[in-house]
Regions:
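A cross-family glycoside hydrolase active-site/sugar-binding cleft signature
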Residues: 16-18, 42, 169, 202
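Proline-centered loop/turn at the N-terminus of a beta-strand
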Residues: 12-14, 38, 165
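Short gly/pro/ser/thr-enriched loop/turn and capping motifs at secondary-structure boundaries
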Residues: 21-23, 49-50, 120
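Glycine-centered loop/turn positions within well-structured domains
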Residues: 30, 47, 143
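Active-site PLP attachment segment
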Residues: 34-71, 77, 95
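Catalytic PLP-binding core of fold-type I/II PLP enzymes
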Residues: 1-29, 62
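PLP-dependent aminotransferase class I/II
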Residues: 1-4, 26, 61-229
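Active-site acidic short loop of glycosyltransferases
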Residues: 10, 29, 36-37, 196
Length: 229
């Protein structure tokens, strides 16, 4: 985002920052969502700051743009019943969701730190290919503990036998979807190779020490799957 902002060079090019998985992340003194024209956050229940159901927020330092967004989220009204903004919809965050988020917001930094601590434990146990090591800041939020392994199916089978759940984030590229098949073909050998080797380990603040120890022991037992090939 910093590079995109600098490349703006005074031109009026809006920059939209996707913050859906980076609640609380910091680079230097800047939080995620603070640099771009607007930052977009998801409050889906599995996010680092999640509501009870679907929800989200847009942040901006532009007062006029903020007012425009407020109009759009409520039918395009500029005042009660006067619909002046095209593209408006009913997308208000209801009070129950907002109240739940306000309870968890003060805990966000603490919960992110717990996620980072879990990732560090995994790395110390031998998960050398865990992607968090490439974060630009030590204030990354460890939304997912994604790593790269050889023979993913066997690795997953081994962890499952130990009672450990895993996931794949994500199993498809945009170019795999029928909706993009009309576009010119684009060779993506690195991405194609990665999607068959990535696996996500459990990583959430509610994990107990025993659960973390269990995953670490499984990583140590299956260390050979992390060797580069």
């Amino acid at each position: 985002v910093d590079a995109a902002v600098k490349a703006k060079l005074g031109k009026s090019i809006p920059i939209v920052e996707d913050c859906a998985q980076s609640h609380g992340a910091k680079v230097g003194n800047l939080r995620a969502g603070a640099q771009a024209t607007i930052g977009c956050f998801s409050f889906y229940p599995t996010k680092n700051l999640g509501a009870l159901g679907d929800g989200g927020a847009i942040v901006t330092s532009d007062a006029a743009l903020a007012e425009h967004m407020r109009n759009l989220r409520q039918y395009g009204w500029t005042k009660r019943y006067l619909q002046e903004r095209p593209g408006g919809r009913n997308s208000r965050l209801d009070e129950l969701q907002a109240g739940f988020l306000l309870v968890f917001l003060p805990l966000l930094d603490e919960r992110n730190a717990k996620r980072r601590a879990i990732v560090k434990r995994y790395m110390a146990s031998g998960a050398t290919a865990i992607h968090a090591q490439f974060a630009q800041s030590d204030q990354y939020v460890a939304h997912l503990a994604v790593c790269t392994v050889n023979n993913r199916d066997k690795f997953v089978e081994n962890l499952t036998s130990e009672g450990i759940s895993t996931g794949v984030h994500y199993p498809y590229l945009d170019t795999d979807f029928p909706t993009t098949k009309h576009l010119p073909p684009m060779p993506l050998p690195v991405s194609e190779g990665a999607k068959s080797r990535i696996v996500t380990l459990p990583c959430f603040p509610e994990m107990t020490e025993d659960e973390i120890d269990l995953v670490c022991a499984a990583i140590e037992k299956n260390n050979s799957f992390f060797e580069a090939r």
